[in-house]
Amino acid sequence: MTIPLYTFVRGDSLGLILLVDEAHSIAEVATRAQRAAAMRVAPAARVGVYRAKVRLDPKLTVASAGLAPLDRIDILPEPLNGV
């Protein structure tokens, strides 16, 4: 099932509605969001996906993370050294 998500990539001047499949991993969602915003924001080497200020495990699927249509997610760059 396709789910539309309000997606905000740090540094982008626009919010995006990203269509994702419930079987996509959170890591795939992050990649797709960065590609969609790439004309305005250079993709970061490492990012976290957050919903309501809670970081989502990149291995979870959209469905297992409990994301619902029109939920907001934020894509935020993270340090490469993991700190």
Provide a role label for each language-model segment.
Residues 1-83:
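Ubiquitin system architectures
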